[in-house]
Amino acid sequence: MPNDKLILLIQGKVLPEHRAELLQTIRETLPLTRAETGVELLYPTTRKDDPNTVVFFEVFSSQDAYDSHMQQEYVKRFFATIQGGLVGEPVVTTLSELS
């Protein structure tokens, strides 16, 4: 039986002057995202050795659930908020669950 889950590890370096705004935006959108159908896990963290590096661990039940998530207005606002607040592009790694 194939596993259709989409598992992502996303890491981005935040410009220090944008850190407070980004963290506030994460706090505002987190409960909305976790309540979405198909969002199995969304866990935002920062690196202990670099608090300006934000790392998200995300698990969606399927690609469709992820696509639906990305269409939510609060997700679009999140990305608009972080525009210009990161050092470069985030690194997105797609993972596979061990069976």
Predicted regions and their residues:
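Glycine-rich beta-strand-turn "strand-cap" elements at beta-sheet edges
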Residues: 1-6, 43-52, 80-99
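N-terminal first-folded block
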Residues: 3-35
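Short alpha-helical
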Residues: 17, 28, 49-51, 73
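Short, well-ordered beta-strand segments in beta-rich or mixed alpha/beta enzyme
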Residues: 6-13, 43-70
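Short hydrophobic/aromatic segments of transmembrane alpha-helices and their interfaces
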Residues: 2-3, 24, 48-49, 58, ...
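Residue-level detection of beta-strand scaffold positions
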Residues: 19, 23-27, 54, 65, ...
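An amphipathic, aromatic/His-enriched active-site/gating alpha helix that lines ligand/cofactor pockets
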Residues: 31-40, 59-93
